[in-house]
């Protein structure tokens, strides 16, 4: 009986080692499980991006409005007979109106 018990304990120890520390053990399972979660997140982002691209393709295939909007926004195109007005931000407008000291001094010396 003693030899059988010893053999079973050795077998149990080997199985526990394989389960916890061996190839395809608990550590590998946890690592792969985390990798799967990360990959599912990436897949969800890519799926959303693909849906947006398919919607954009459908808009472009659907008619002239989407093509016209894209030409206006991305290429700055206008229709014949339209006027284009560029709005300058307030900070740039103030900087353009205030004369610098070098311009003032050069104007005074020329008179």
Swiss-Prot record:
Membrane protein topology class: Single-pass type II membrane protein
Stretches that traverse the bilayer: 4-21
Biased composition (Low complexity): 97-111
Coiled coil: 33-63
Keyword Cell inner membrane: yes
Localization per Swiss-Prot or TrEMBL: Cell inner membrane
Predominant localisation class: membrane
GO-annotated biological processes: FtsZ-dependent cytokinesis
Any one Gene Ontology cellular component term annotated for this protein: cell division site
Keywords: Cell cycle, Cell division, Cell inner membrane, Cell membrane, Coiled coil, Membrane, Transmembrane, Transmembrane helix
Spans within the Periplasmic topological domain: 22-111
Region (Disordered): 88-111
A Pfam entry, by short name: DivIC
Cytoplasmic side stretches: 1-3
Described function: Essential cell division protein. May link together the upstream cell division proteins, which are predominantly cytoplasmic, with the downstream cell division proteins, which are predominantly periplasmic.
Subunit structure: Part of a complex composed of FtsB, FtsL and FtsQ.
Family statement drawn from the similarity comment of this UniProt entry: Belongs to the FtsB family.
Cross-referenced NCBIfam families: PRK00888.1
Protein name: Cell division protein FtsB
């Amino acid at each position: 009986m003693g030899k059988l018990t010893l053999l079973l304990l050795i077998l149990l120890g080997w199985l526990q080692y394989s389960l916890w520390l061996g190839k395809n053990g608990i550590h590998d399972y946890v690592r792969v499980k985390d990798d799967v979660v990360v990959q599912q997140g990436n897949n969800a982002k890519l799926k959303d991006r693909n849906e947006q691209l398919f919607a954009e393709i459908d808009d472009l295939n659907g008619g002239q409005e989407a093509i016209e909007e894209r030409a206006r926004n991305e290429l700055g195109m206008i229709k014949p007979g339209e006027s284009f007005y560029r709005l300058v931000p307030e900070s740039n407008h103030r900087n353009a109106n205030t004369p610098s000291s070098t311009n003032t001094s050069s104007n005074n010396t020329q008179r």
